[in-house]
Swiss-Prot record:
Function: Involved in biosynthesis of the thiamine precursor thiazole. Catalyzes the conversion of NAD and glycine to adenosine diphosphate 5-(2-hydroxyethyl)-4-methylthiazole-2-carboxylic acid (ADT), an adenylated thiazole intermediate. The reaction includes an iron-dependent sulfide transfer from a conserved cysteine residue of the protein to a thiazole intermediate. The enzyme can only undergo a single turnover, which suggests it is a suicide enzyme. May have additional roles in adaptation to various stress conditions and in DNA damage tolerance.
Family: Belongs to the THI4 family.
Binding site for substrate: 86, 107-108, 115, 183, 222, 237, 289, 299-301
Gene Ontology biological-process entries: mitochondrial genome maintenance; thiamine biosynthetic process; thiazole biosynthetic process
Catalytic activity field: [ADP-thiazole synthase]-L-cysteine + glycine + NAD(+) = [ADP-thiazole synthase]-dehydroalanine + ADP-5-ethyl-4-methylthiazole-2-carboxylate + nicotinamide + 3 H2O + 2 H(+)
EC numbers on record: 2.4.2.60
SUPFAM superfamilies recorded: FAD/NAD(P)-binding domain
Protein name: Thiamine thiazole synthase
UniProt gene name: thiA
GO cellular component, one term: cytosol
Amino acid sequence: MSPPAAIFEPTVAPTGIKGKVVVPETATIPGDSQTKLLDHFGGKWDNFKFAPIRESQVSRAMTRRYFQDLDRYAESDVVIVGAGSCGLSTAYVLAKARPDLKIAIIEASVSPGGGAWLGGQLFSAMVMRRPAELFLNELGVPYEEDPDMPNYVVVKHASLFTSTLLSKVLSFPNVKLFNATCVEDLVTRPGPNGNAQEVQIAGVVTNWTLVTLHHDDHSCMDPNTINAPVIISTTGHDGPFGAFSAKRLVSMTTIDKLGGMRGLDMNSAEDAIVKNTREVAKGLIIGGMELSEIDGFNRMGPTFGAMVLSGVKAAEEALRVFDDRKRECAE
């Protein structure tokens, strides 16, 4: 049985650039949009021609908007590090609950989504244990359920989930995704009496991913920064960019050492990750598999329910501490 598709009304904000935002009407009847396209274009290709353009117009259209976004989000309310299934779920819940917050998502890869474009071992299907199907219902993502196997549901392709979630997140006017961008460090404020274990996180240090990958063979580049009173780190378990914030907390002595992710145990891991998603240092919330490196939880393997519900918990934590952290960062 598949849930009905949710009706989603995309919202838009003024761009600050002369012009208007157009939100096309979507087809409500299967095949309707295809029929309209074929009616418009079909059999007319010999006379087809795009509207004329000058190359500089394309350059200006891109750069004006990108640098406007850099300027707007230099002071953000929340920065989410990592646009995998956990980070995107966090962004969705936060942006929907608090449309007044400016939310920046920083993703090192060109393609957001992390490992959630496929299930385990490059297979297509995505398995989520109940009650994570409630998040699928919220998004309107169809899934299969088996009366003989009532404890989990299956999305036919992980990419269906991720593309749906990503499209909804990017439709919010208060969200900006900066992909192909790395977080190289954390912006900090001293704790009372200089206590490193009470340091406050007050933003992120960013750079182009291609620059970050070549610091060992290039003399450039100094980074950029984004200030925010709440940082949510969902960079996954240890890897080239994984567990970044967790490892940085150790190197700046805010925590003594990492707990080290344990072996795979789905039953133990998923509950632990969701329940313990929290603010691990003032202004820094860690969720998803990155948390396993802090606390020494088991890995969960190819089941994704804890990723999305850890994102829900991270959003709840951010809403709980936001006002206090914003006031403290302003002092």
